[in-house]
């Protein structure tokens, strides 16, 4: 699939990026190559290929879900300039 220069201009405008006129030819060729690759990938017959959720057939080992850090919440509350009912109080910033 070949891309036209006008399409690259439109895409760059919609993406809010600036593309120099000197880069348009090179960018058009690169994007066209990527689109050609996608077309070739779509042409591959995958009818007898089972979908995969992961490239490896191994099961991940899971670690035991154990608390490894102590709770410092109360200590941090004491360090705060203002705290109430476990919440940090901050000055109002919006009227």
Swiss-Prot record:
GO molecular function, one term: ATP binding
Record-listed E.C. numbers: 6.3.5.-
InterPro entries in the record: Asp/Glu-ADT_sf_sub_c (IPR036113), GatC (IPR003837)
Keywords, sorted A to Z: ATP-binding, Ligase, Nucleotide-binding, Protein biosynthesis
Entry keyword annotation includes RNA-binding: no
A GO BP annotation: regulation of translational fidelity
Recorded superkingdom: Bacteria
Catalyzed reactions: L-glutamyl-tRNA(Gln) + L-glutamine + ATP + H2O = L-glutaminyl-tRNA(Gln) + L-glutamate + ADP + phosphate + H(+); L-aspartyl-tRNA(Asn) + L-glutamine + ATP + H2O = L-asparaginyl-tRNA(Asn) + L-glutamate + ADP + phosphate + 2 H(+)
Entry keyword Cell cycle: no
PANTHER family: GLUTAMYL-TRNA(GLN) AMIDOTRANSFERASE SUBUNIT C, MITOCHONDRIAL (PTHR15004:SF0)
Subunit description: Heterotrimer of A, B and C subunits.
Function: Allows the formation of correctly charged Asn-tRNA(Asn) or Gln-tRNA(Gln) through the transamidation of misacylated Asp-tRNA(Asn) or Glu-tRNA(Gln) in organisms which lack either or both of asparaginyl-tRNA or glutaminyl-tRNA synthetases. The reaction takes place in the presence of glutamine and ATP through an activated phospho-Asp-tRNA(Asn) or phospho-Glu-tRNA(Gln).
Family per record: Belongs to the GatC family.
Protein known as: Aspartyl/glutamyl-tRNA(Asn/Gln) amidotransferase subunit C
Native source species: Hydrogenovibrio crunogenus (strain DSM 25203 / XCL-2)
């Amino acid at each position: 699939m070949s891309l036209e220069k006008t399409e690259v201009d439109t895409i760059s405008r919609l993406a809010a990026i600036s593309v120099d006129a000197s880069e348009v030819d090179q960018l058009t060729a690169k994007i066209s190559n990527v689109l050609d690759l996608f077309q070739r990938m779509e042409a591959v017959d995958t009818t007898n290929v089972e979908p995969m959720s992961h490239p490896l057939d191994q099961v991940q080992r899971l670690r035991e879900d154990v608390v490894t850090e102590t709770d410092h919440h109360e200590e941090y509350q004491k360090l705060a300039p203002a705290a109430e009912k476990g919440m940090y109080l901050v000055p109002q910033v919006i009227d």
